[in-house]
């Protein structure tokens, strides 16, 4: 394919136009009074969204050079979303300002390389200062971060905080579309897997068709059990103690299963058999997880361990086990042991090392089950358009909350960046020439998010920034008041701010040091009738297939024969 080339100021000018086109579409969404963007779809109703990445991915510009600029800014939004889950519009606003100021200075003769060095030094200092300013998050602060990220929706904030409280930070929290109008939180407590009882005769509650035991012992093995002789020692032990026994094995069958059922129905034993979850190596990993969770030992063929020699100390313990026809849920005791923490850390290391999405999904599931459960936020809304928009907001809020727990919180509304910008004055004094100019570009860029939040709320951005500096308080765009944002619960996750700033300067520094842009030459328009012309003319072209042997026979079934 032929290529188009653009050089120097012309190339940078085209890139800047693309940057501005995309950034201007995104920045109207920032802040509590950010506006929506309507996106036409080829099929179905238009989407009404408030999510930066979703908007960015929909934009393709006609000019190929401008489109490259737009796609570079889309990359900023996507990278920030991928790593932090939120802050995409903040990153875009920062990048746009840095690009505009950087290109203005290079056009005036500044060295783009020295500008970049100055900008990178400034961002490095801001990141260090941000870490010092961050505060750990807990309690109500979790709800406040989620509420702010959800556009001020307190219902969503409370729901996310409740979900994290119930399943812990390591637990899995997913967002799904609901079939009802209401948005609800559904929590599965404990470790659940999709294997039920081996026989319906193990049922303890005839009305609900479940088998449920309080404080049972659990025998965990990857063996197939056919002979009751293998189980007699452990059965005698639990019978003396009077505790229920769950046998979790690859399979319990034949004589062993029949004997267990008979003794259960006679009231001699409180017992149930369950097939082990998953298959192959994943089964061994799952059984190992259950052993760690319950404080038991996995009786494994790989370790040459024998069922006849099982001791009471080898059995796992749980607070409650509920078994249905298709699933089993183990609610562990509250005591969190070191072995469990180490197991979770080990799985997290595996997660970092794998690139397979399937493996990542399964590893995350294992972490969640060990950590205490799974929470599902089921999103409801009157229309499909509102449902999609609400789902995106909840996902952003959930991601921002996780980021806040990881690296702490700071005052929101762009105020923290504004405060940190004041510390760049000393750095600028230590530098000279274009590096100093680069620092000053970052210092001014850090005011851009606050200005845009104010503009979207109907205020003058420059006046708001000036008032914040004068009063020493943050700006609540929802009410138009100047308050202590930490006390008011208007918070941002430090991780989100850090990544937004780092991703913005990364792309901006690349853009201002660009000298040549290469783009694909657009395809010439199709000749009339070749595409999109008379539909029957197009059918005529198919007539050429008549010469293809057997296909020619199908020609007899053509339009003339049907007349």
UniProtKB/Swiss-Prot annotation:
InterPro entries: Chaperonin_Cpn60_CS (IPR018370), Cpn60/GroEL (IPR001844), Cpn60/GroEL/TCP-1 (IPR002423), GroEL-like_apical_dom_sf (IPR027409), GROEL-like_equatorial_sf (IPR027413), TCP-1-like_intermed_sf (IPR027410). Pfam families: Cpn60_TCP1 (PF00118). Its main location: cytoplasm. SUPFAM superfamilies: GroEL apical domain-like, GroEL equatorial domain-like, GroEL-intermediate domain like. Its EC number is 5.6.1.7. Residues 530-541 have a biased composition (Gly residues). PROSITE patterns: CHAPERONINS_CPN60. The keyword Chaperone applies. It catalyses: ATP + H2O + a folded polypeptide = ADP + phosphate + an unfolded polypeptide. ATP binds at residues 29-32, 86-90, 413, 492. It is found in: Cytoplasm. It is an enzyme of class 5 (isomerase). Residues 520-541 are annotated as: Disordered. Keywords: ATP-binding, Chaperone, Cytoplasm, Isomerase, Nucleotide-binding. NCBIfam families: GroEL (TIGR02348), PRK00013.1 (NF000592), PRK12849.1 (NF009487), PRK12850.1 (NF009488), PRK12851.1 (NF009489). Forms a cylinder of 14 subunits composed of two heptameric rings stacked back-to-back. Interacts with the co-chaperonin GroES. Belongs to the chaperonin (HSP60) family. Together with its co-chaperonin GroES, plays an essential role in assisting protein folding. The GroEL-GroES system forms a nano-cage that allows encapsulation of the non-native substrate proteins and provides a physical environment optimized to promote and accelerate protein folding. This is Chaperonin GroEL 1. It comes from Prochlorococcus marinus (strain NATL1A).
């Amino acid at each position: 394919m032929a290529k188009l080339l653009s050089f120097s100021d012309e190339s940078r000018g085209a890139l800047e136009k693309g940057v501005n086109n995309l950034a201007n579409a995104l920045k109207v969404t920032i802040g509590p009074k950010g506006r929506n963007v309507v996106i036409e779809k080829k099929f179905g109703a238009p989407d009404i969204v408030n999510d930066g990445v979703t908007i960015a991915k929909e934009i393709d510009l006609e000019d190929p050079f401008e489109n490259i600029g737009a796609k570079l800014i889309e990359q900023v939004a996507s990278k920030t979303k991928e790593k932090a889950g939120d802050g995409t519009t903040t990153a875009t606003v920062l990048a746009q300002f840095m690009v505009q100021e950087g290109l203005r200075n290079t056009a005036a003769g500044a060295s783009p390389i020295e500008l970049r060095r100055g900008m990178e030094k400034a961002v490095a200092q801001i990141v260090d200062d941000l870490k010092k300013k961050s505060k750990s998050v807990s309690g109500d602060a979790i709800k406040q971060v989620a509420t702010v990220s959800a556009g001020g929706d307190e219902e969503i904030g409370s729901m996310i905080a409740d979900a994290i409280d119930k399943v812990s930070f390591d637990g899995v929290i997913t967002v799904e579309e609901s079939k009802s109008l209401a948005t609800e939180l559904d929590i599965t407590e404990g470790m659940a897997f999709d294997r039920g009882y081996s026989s319906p005769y193990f049922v303890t509650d005839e009305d609900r068709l479940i088998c449920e035991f309080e404080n049972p012992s659990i025998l965990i093995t990857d063996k197939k059990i056919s002979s009751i002789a293998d189980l007699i020692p452990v059965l005698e032990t639990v019978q003396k103690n009077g505790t229920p026994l769950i046998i979790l094995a690859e399979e319990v069958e034949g004589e062993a299963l029949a004997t267990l059922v008979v003794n259960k129905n006679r009231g001699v034993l409180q017992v149930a058999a369950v097939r082990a979850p998953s298959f192959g190596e994943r089964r061994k990993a799952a059984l190992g997880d259950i052993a760690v969770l319950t404080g038991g030992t996995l009786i494994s063929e790989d370790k040459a361990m024998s069922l006849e020699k099982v001791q009471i100390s080898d059995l796992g313990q749980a607070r409650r086990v509920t078994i249905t026809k298709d699933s089993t849920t183990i609610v562990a005791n509250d005591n969190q042991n070191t072995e469990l923490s180490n197991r979770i850390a080990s799985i997290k290391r595996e997660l970092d090392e794998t690139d397979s999405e399937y493996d990542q999904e399964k590893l995350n599931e294992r972490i969640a089950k060990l950590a205490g459960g799974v929470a599902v936020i089921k999103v409801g809304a009157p229309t499909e358009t509102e449902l999609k928009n609400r789902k995106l907001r909840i996902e952003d809020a959930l991601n921002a909350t996780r980021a806040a727990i990881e690296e702490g919180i700071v005052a929101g509304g762009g105020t923290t960046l504004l405060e940190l910008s004041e510390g760049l004055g000393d750095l600028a004094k230590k530098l000279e020439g274009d590096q100093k100019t680069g620092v000053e570009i970052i210092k001014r860029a850090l005011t851009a998010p606050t200005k845009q939040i104010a503009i979207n709320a109907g205020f003058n951005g420059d006046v708001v920034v000036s008032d914040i500096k004068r009063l020493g308080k943050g700006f609540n765009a929802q009410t138009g008041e100047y308050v202590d944002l930490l006390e008011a619960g208007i918070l941002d996750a430090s991780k989100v701010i850090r990544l937004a700033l780092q991703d913005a300067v990364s792309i901006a520094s690349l853009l201002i040091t660009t000298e040549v842009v290469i783009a694909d030459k657009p395809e010439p328009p199709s000749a009339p009738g070749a595409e999109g012309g008379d539909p029957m003319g197009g059918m005529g072209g198919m007539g050429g297939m008549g010469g293809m042997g057997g296909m020619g026979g199908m020609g007899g079934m053509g339009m003339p024969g049907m007349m």
